[in-house]
Amino acid sequence: MFKKILIANRGEIALRVIRTCKEMGIKTVAVYSTADAESLHVKFADEAVCIGPPASSESYLKVSNIIAAAEITNADAIHPGYGFLSENAKFSKICEEHDIKFIGASPEMIDRMGDKANAKATMIAAGVPCVPGSEGIIKDFEECKKLAKETGYPVMLKASAGGGGKGMRAVWKPENLKDAWDSARQESKAAFGNDDMYMEKLIEEPRHIEIQVVGDSTGRACHLSERDCSIQRRHQKLTEEVPSPFMTNALRKKMGEAAVKAAEFIKYEGAGTVEFLVDKHRNFYFMEMNTRIQVEHPITEQVIDFDLIREQILVAAKVPISGKNYTPKLHSIECRINAEDPFNGFRPSPGKITTLHAPGGHGIRLDTHVYAGYTIPPNYDSMIAKLITTAQTREEAISKMKRALDEFVIEGIKTTIPFHRQLMDHPDYLAGNYTTKFMEDFVIEKPIEE
């Protein structure tokens, strides 16, 4: 087992990994930028190393500084968390070259599944259902035109190196294809340094349902049930739940089998997520695979009583998995609390937290790195907390979430707590009747000024 793990991340996920390491008797090293000197992950780790100024490119994305921090502290493994370098094949390879275990996917696996067109071709070979469209990179606009006609409108153009909704364009008519092709490629080039595109049939108003998988060094994989991540804004998830209110036992079995087939076909090692689009007829199609821990992993942990970070560490240390597939016995919901103003177009709201009162009670979990007196830097993602409720039924989990959101007080900055509180009362949400288009019609009501 590892003696010391460096966490190449910040915020709540760094703290989350530190907590599991402490329980496992593993020493921890936090890395931080000068903007994060007062963050809780720095205070809770056994050692902490400053790796640069606030800009991510000079700190959390600066591979040489992170490797140097691992070497001077004698860390024998690095946990990348999510975001930053978690799906960076080059970083995974450099860790390998320095005899430091990367607690994540191998460089080859990241390359294979990180390139969306490659991943789709791999899944077709594995016999996993995929959205109709191109089977690889589109070589030029002429091929794009031909493919769109064959696939049938509407189509979705996607950046092969994409993520976070960048380089994606929905095209409903042939006359709009050229503009979409040009703008998607430009956006992709600017964001990823790569303008390769592929095309898929646009699945209208789908559910976004992902399956959590774990694979080990023996080539065996299992699934830990689904998460419904359909409520999104600009392709960014806002809230997630398990089980999905749209799920049936038969569909879970099929999707779980497909996800395990995908993981075993590529001999996947570690925790990963196979993401699917599910249409209104419950046909499901592979979308992508994330070769890292997900932001929303706690809801899976809650319903199957399983520490996914611990499992990541064990698998990285070559401990075989049990191979058992899991079905949720409880219902869990997560609300991502962001430092954003929901009444002002979700504009970021960094600054100093003057008051913080956290909710508590049975079935409430709060993963956060912030506290009263903490200043949220403007340099990073705006998520400051994940509020999770767990209960016997969906109705009870929603009731708990309403109560917890009412109890949750953060002052000094704007947060998305009021948005989530309104969401929990929305009739379509209460009925479990929502798709990825839900936020297009959701109107946030401003409170009446007293």
Placement of each model-derived feature along the sequence:
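N-terminal nucleotide-binding beta1-loop-alpha1 segment
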Residues: 159
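Acidic/histidine-enriched active-site and ligand-binding environments that engage anionic O-linkages
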Residues: 146-156
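ATP-dependent carboxylate activation and anion-phosphoryl transfer catalytic cores
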Residues: 7-23, 48-50, 71-73, 96, ...
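Conserved beta3 strand of the protein kinase N-lobe
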Residues: 133-134
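Methionine-biased hydrophobic packing positions in alpha-helices, especially
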Residues: 110-113, 123, 156, 168, ...
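Short secondary-structure boundary/hinge segments and terminal tails
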Residues: 38-39, 87-88, 113, 140-142, ...
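ATP-binding N-terminal substructure of ATP-dependent carboxylate-amine bond-forming enzymes
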Residues: 1-126, 138-146, 396
